Curated annotation (Swiss-Prot):
Name of the protein described by the UniProt record: UPF0122 protein SEQ_1180
Family label: Belongs to the UPF0122 family.
Organism this protein belongs to: Streptococcus equi subsp. equi (strain 4047)
One protein family per Pfam: UPF0122
Disulfide bonds: none
SUPFAM superfamilies reported for this sequence: Sigma3 and sigma4 domains of RNA polymerase sigma factors
Domain of life (superkingdom): Bacteria
PANTHER family registered for this protein in UniProt: UPF0122 PROTEIN CBO2450/CLC_2298, UPF0122 PROTEIN YLXM
Taxon lineage: Bacteria, Bacillati, Bacillota, Bacilli, Lactobacillales
InterPro entries noted in UniProt: RNA_pol_sigma_r3/r4-like, UPF0122, UPF0122_fam_protein, WH-like_DNA-bd_sf
Functional description taken from the UniProt entry: Might take part in the signal recognition particle (SRP) pathway. This is inferred from the conservation of its genetic proximity to ftsY/ffh. May be a regulatory protein.
HAMAP family reported for this sequence: UPF0122
Length: 110
């Protein structure tokens, strides 16, 4: 499994998990976050390996569709880069540092 794809799916899952069904959440979390194999997931849920594979592929497409429409992950990346640039340019500005800290905590809350 490609590390870039795994990282992206985990990130998209963090942003959009609440929009998925319980089954979709379980399969994606086990497959990407917990590194279960298709066979292990199939055994745990009493379904075929093919059923798990199909569900994961559909859920990947759903997560990508949410990102295409909502841009939550890509906007988060852009904000993080801007915050890093500001902190690098104004390292001793405590006002900016405090405001960025507040904005970052908003981005990272559950």
């Amino acid at each position: 499994m490609e590390i870039e794809k795994t990282n992206r799916m985990n990130a998209l899952f963090e942003f959009y998990a609440a929009l998925l069904t319980d089954k979709q959440m379980n399969y994606i979390e086990l497959y990407y976050a917990d590194d279960y194999s298709l066979a292990e997931i199939a055994e745990e849920f009493g379904v075929s390996r093919q059923a798990v594979y199909d569900n994961i592929k559909r859920t990947e497409k759903i997560l990508e569709a949410y990102e295409m429409k909502l841009h939550m992950y890509s906007d988060y990346i852009v904000r993080s880069e801007i915050f890093d640039d500001i902190l690098a340019k104004y390292p001793s500005d405590h006002y900016l540092r405090d405001k960025i800290s507040i904005l970052t905590s908003i981005d990272n809350r559950d």
